[in-house]
Design a protein with these regions (language model features):
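Catalytic zinc-binding patch centered on the HExxH motif and its immediate surroundings
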Residues: 1-9, 18-44, 55
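Well-ordered beta-strand scaffold positions
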Residues: 13-15
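Short His-Asn-centered micro-motif
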Residues: 47-49
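Small, basic N-terminal interaction modules of short regulatory proteins
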Residues: 52
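Hydrophobic (often cysteine-bearing) scaffold residues that line and stabilize catalytic clefts
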Residues: 55, 59, 81-84
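Active-site recognition of the HExxH zinc-binding catalytic motif
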Residues: 56-68
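Post-HExxH zinc-binding segment in Zn-dependent metallohydrolases
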Residues: 74-104
Length: 104
């Protein structure tokens, strides 16, 4: 089976989305129940191939990318209601566009 991949740009960075096997996901250091993984160092999103909710997983991982690229990091533990609304409004077009292109 051919590996599905796609590149996209965000904030002057080039990222790659890849569908991978469970073995490949585990090689990246993740547990066997991981559906998706964002690797900031290499600017890659890995998605477990043949999962039922690949769209949801892809959108989840794209949110990690968007937050990272626009200055939010894993240390940002608290967002108020307005913060969440602003983030969703700001990233919606980007996330929807990339997800549609990959899932075609």
């Amino acid at each position: 089976m051919e590996k599905k991949t796609m590149e996209f740009e965000i904030n002057n960075g080039l990222w790659t989305i890849e569908e991978v096997s469970e073995e490949e996901m585990i090689r990246e250091g993740e547990k066997d129940y991981t559906l998706g993984l964002t690797i900031y160092k290499t600017q890659r999103i890995l998605l477990l191939r043949n999962q039922k909710n690949i769209k949801k997983t892809l959108v989840h991982e794209l949110m990690h990318v968007w937050l990272y690229e626009y200055g939010h990091n894993a240390q940002d533990r608290q967002f108020n209601h307005e913060d969440v609304c602003e983030i969703v409004a700001s990233c919606n077009d980007f996330v929807s566009d990339i997800a549609k292109r990959f899932l075609r």
